[in-house]
Amino acid sequence: MIRNFTKGLLINNLNINKFGSTKIRPFCSTITKNDKNNVINILKKRGFIHQMTASDIEMIKMTSTNNNNNNDNNNNNNNNKVSLYAGFDPTADSLHIGNLLTLMVMLHFKRHGHNPIALMGGATALIGDPSGKSSDRVMLTEEFIEGNLKHIRENITAVLGEDTLVVNNIEWNKTMDVISFLREVGSYFRVGSMIKKDFIQNRLSDSNENGISFTEFCYSLFQANDFAHLFLKHGCSIQIGGSDQWGNITAGCDLIRKKLKGNAQGITIPLLTNSAGKKLGKSEGNSIWLSPHRTSPYKFYQYWIQVSDEDVERLLKLFTLIPLEEISILVQKHNENPHLRLGQKTIAEHVTRLIHGQKGVEEALNTTELLFGESNKLLTPNASTTKIGDFDIGYLLSRVNFIELERSKFVDNQTEPILNLFAQISDASKSKVKQLLQSKSIYLNNIPVASNSQFIQSSDLIANDFIYLKSGKKIYYLIKFI
């Protein structure tokens, strides 16, 4: 039973019923009646656009579609369908929520009837993108990159759908020799112009002793050639990227204009920051990844639950498909009772469902309920059930941040009482821990620790491996003995 979080709100398809459970609108592959505007206008209103290589009028004209029919099923019937792409270098075995911002832009284009193309940089990852970096990237092996590609593809299709065209630039780069590259690509670029680009200037500045290698200096030429290849083969005329990709994107636009006499444009997305100007996407110093083997659905969900009230409206616009009119009403309701965290819970459920599906949402909600809700009473070795919902309690606990400790040191060892263990993991003094114990403020598996000498016994272990230590409402430690 999921704990009731909110009360009494109905916003079109976003339904918070009187018992508090949230029902999220199903994923919609095409635009709704409330989103009839051009995709560029929608992106600007939602805060996605940092820079564009053409004026608003030109970009709107380029991406205009015939959406005059009120039947949602006909929204893909248009005369001006464009293909656009964004690149994702497989430098890790998962994308992160910074990449998700780019995927959301592509999703908006797709819902407006356009064709997104996801490019996996199997070739460019071997070179290393210098954009936004102060020193050379570590050179990656082909085997490492190949191992990452499968996970990156899964991240992409989770958001954009299995029907999305996903390409790997190793396909056309592996057969191009150096002479052909210099003649067919390099001849269209001038070193003077390349040096003037901001990301090159930053690496060549007096304050940067590392400089830039010739390998990374040529990166933008490879990315430009990717754009030209997609322009020729797939009619791709727009490239999407982060704000640090402006120089690489304009290089591609220039190559298409000079070599192919074509018209191509670029759009950059602002850096993802919170209201305090701090870069979003990390929790306790760790990146928030899209792949469940890197960030579990519970941890992913909790990241969004913990965003500040000041960031709620912006994140609703960026990471959900809720129409803007509904977001305004939702934010108003959120501000009336911010302690209910309606905005954060809406974001968390929408984004978790988008990335991990309904099962991921259920895993996250059940884990949250297990740790903080009424089902917390199940965190005892003698609980009446070993499951919550469809999930085994041991499995849910294994997906939470836990501390690993040596079993032989703390379990069935009378010389290592809970007092010592709690002091070690909390960095509190033993005198402070003694005060907490005397006031019955430390709980082992939801039962107050009885004395300073109480130690952990095998019979205390949940799912054979875990204990749950808690002090107050906000301080808890999940410990796994190995």
Curated annotation (Swiss-Prot):
Highest taxon of source: Eukaryota
InterPro entries: aa-tRNA-synth_I_CS, aa-tRNA-synth_Ic, Rossmann-like_a/b/a_fold, S4_RNA-bd_sf, Tyr-tRNA-ligase, Tyr-tRNA-ligase_bac-type, Tyr-tRNA-ligase_bac_1
E.C. number(s) listed in UniProt: 6.1.1.1
GO biological process: tRNA aminoacylation; tyrosyl-tRNA aminoacylation
Gene Ontology molecular function terms on file: ATP binding; RNA binding; tyrosine-tRNA ligase activity
Main location group: mitochondrion
Motif ('HIGH' region): 90-99
Catalytic activity: tRNA(Tyr) + L-tyrosine + ATP = L-tyrosyl-tRNA(Tyr) + AMP + diphosphate + H(+)
Short motif ('KMSKS' region): ranges: 279-283
Keywords: Aminoacyl-tRNA synthetase, ATP-binding, Ligase, Mitochondrion, Nucleotide-binding, Protein biosynthesis, RNA-binding, Transit peptide
Enzyme's top EC category: ligase
Occurrences of domain S4 RNA-binding (ranges): 416-480
Tagged with keyword RNA-binding: yes
Amino-acid positions noted as binding L-tyrosine in the UniProt annotation, renumbered to this chain: Y85, D129, Y219, Q223, D226, Q245
CDD domains on file: TyrRS_core
Binding site for ATP: D89, K282
GO cellular component, one term: mitochondrial matrix
Keyword set includes Disulfide bond: no
Subcellular compartments: Mitochondrion matrix
Xref: PANTHER family: TYROSINE--TRNA LIGASE, MITOCHONDRIAL, TYROSYL-TRNA SYNTHETASE
Family: Belongs to the class-I aminoacyl-tRNA synthetase family.
Known partners and oligomeric status: Homodimer.
Role of this protein: Catalyzes the attachment of tyrosine to tRNA(Tyr) in a two-step reaction: tyrosine is first activated by ATP to form Tyr-AMP and then transferred to the acceptor end of tRNA(Tyr).
Record protein name field: Probable tyrosine--tRNA ligase, mitochondrial
Gene designation: mtyrS
